[in-house]
Amino acid sequence: MERREHLTLTFHSPEVPKIKGNRKYQRPTVPAKKHPSASMSCQRQQQLMDQAHIYIRTLCGSLCSFSLLMLIAMSPLNWVQFLVIKNGLELYAGLWTLCNHELCWSHTPKPPYYLQYSRAFFLISVFTILTGLGWLFSSWILNRGSMTTNLDLKVSMLSFISATCLLLCLNLFVAQVHWHTRDAMESDLLWTYYLNWCSDIFYMFAGIISLLNYLTSRSPACDENVTVIPTERSRLGVGPVTTVSPAKDEGPRSEMESLSVREKNLPKSGLWW
């Protein structure tokens, strides 16, 4: 017959807090999982946060720069196509371009001045976003860390203002087109006009990102002097873990020691009797 090998299994039961009055409570606990940032120093965490803010600020600057270049590139082109109903003649015009035909609008301002208001809001939008980009580029070149807290808020506000002005510009241009082509012509907006809407969306998106970057930069900095109390969880993940302070645990221990001393003394006293 083959001899069966006897295997000995040992289980590790670490010391855990005990419930008062229950000596059989032996639920093993293990430390909770640590976050990767818990082992980092406060200086390293702050350095990573500053680097992330710089990357986000660069993204906002790139969006605004791309939108501005696209806006400037579309401005000298035609935005609308006119079709004369009587003879089928096609005419083209834009915000800054005018056709020489008598049916097109002229350079002379006429009420309700939709075209002039549209041009004014276009210029305000361009100059506003140029101001924000100038602040961003100056912060990158000079590397001024003192103004970074309010820089994101300023860029966000300028992006929203520029997007609002561009929105008014596009709506006023459409109003000018509808007013000019009442009965004699039909109008059709070209792809160059719709690309300006993409620039407006990018301005809004950059403003939202910059605002979120400003809100996250206002979070309190890490303090190395703050003591962190480690947490414990059940190994099985079921039920709460009771924590008993050493001061409270001394009472049950002293009672248990006194009971054990009495039990030892009782047999001795019986011998004397």
Curated annotation (Swiss-Prot):
Location within or outside the cell: Membrane
GO annotations of cellular component type: plasma membrane
The UniProt record lists the keyword Membrane: yes
UniProt biased composition (Basic and acidic residues): 247-266
Record field: transmembrane: 53-75, 121-141, 155-175, 189-209
Annotated stretches, region: Disordered: 242-273
Keywords: Membrane, Transmembrane, Transmembrane helix
Membrane topology designation: Multi-pass membrane protein
Superkingdom in the source lineage: Eukaryota
Name the record gives this protein: Transmembrane protein 202
Native organism: Homo sapiens
